[in-house]
Swiss-Prot record:
Transmembrane segments: none annotated. Belongs to the azoreductase type 1 family. InterPro entries: Flavodoxin_fold (IPR003680), Flavoprotein-like_sf (IPR029039), FMN-dep_NADH:Q_OxRdtase_AzoR1 (IPR050104), NADH:quinone_OxRdtase_FMN_depd (IPR023048). It comes from the Bacteria. This is FMN-dependent NADH:quinone oxidoreductase. Pfam families: Flavodoxin_2.
Length: 206
């Protein structure tokens, strides 16, 4: 079994989402010690945003592609391979300005590729990254799980939509909300998220 773990927070020691991904992966490995973990830190090793040159490279002769762009194309194929070969996807995704970090968006733009992770059949989209479970470790400074703030959530809704689009429908969100409201709420929210991780993985063992 292969697990692909991704961190996207620009914070390091104080990151809530990183704390949760570490906890999740550590607990998972104790249950499934044979798991091969592939880890990507999108802040420490950022992926360049998709550019016109990278996009156009798929439709020009290879002799016309520069070494720099060829390296970018190879990276895209590596990212897609990491995703498709994984049975489990774990993403640390903090909410930034009601959405996701640009670092995570760069990764998404590299793996959502026609003919690789989705295709069109009779005019309808068919995801090709099927048979996977996704766990999203979500952190939010405020509370966005109820009206009226619910309408400001372009983080979890977007991630659900894009993963569904490429064929991943088994998605579980584990969130820590209100982490910037106050220290007491932050601690309580983290404890609740950790408890949910433990509960989920205990259920996996049953």
């Amino acid at each position: 079994m292969k697990l692909l773990a991704i961190d996207s927070s620009i914070l390091t020691n104080t990151s809530v989402s990183r704390q949760l991904t570490r906890s999740f992966v550590s607990r998972w490995q104790k249950i499934y010690p044979e798991t091969e973990v592939v880890y990507r830190d999108l802040h420490a090793q950022p992926i360049n945003h998709l550019s016109q040159k990278i996009l156009a490279a798929n439709s020009v002769p290879s002799t016309q592609i520069s070494a720099e762009i060829r390296e970018e194309m190879n990276l895209s194929m590596q990212l897609i391979s990491e995703l498709l070969s994984a049975s489990v996807l774990v993403i640390g995704a903090p909410m930034y300005n009601f959405s996701i970090p640009s670092q995570l968006k760069s990764w998404i733009d590299r793996i959502v590729i026609a003919g690789k992770t989705f295709k069109y059949v009779d005019g309808k989209v068919q995801g090709l990254a099927t048979g996977k479970r996704a766990y999203i470790l979500s952190s939010r400074g405020g509370f966005y799980n109820a009206e009226p703030a619910l309408n400001l959530d372009h983080q979890e809704r977007y991630l659900t939509s894009i993963l569904n689009f490429i064929g991943i429908s088994d998605i579980t969100f584990i969130r820590a909300e209100g982490v910037n409201v106050g220290e007491e709420i932050r601690t309580q929210s983290l404890h609740q998220a950790e408890a949910k991780i433990q509960q989920l993985l205990q259920f996996q063992m049953a």
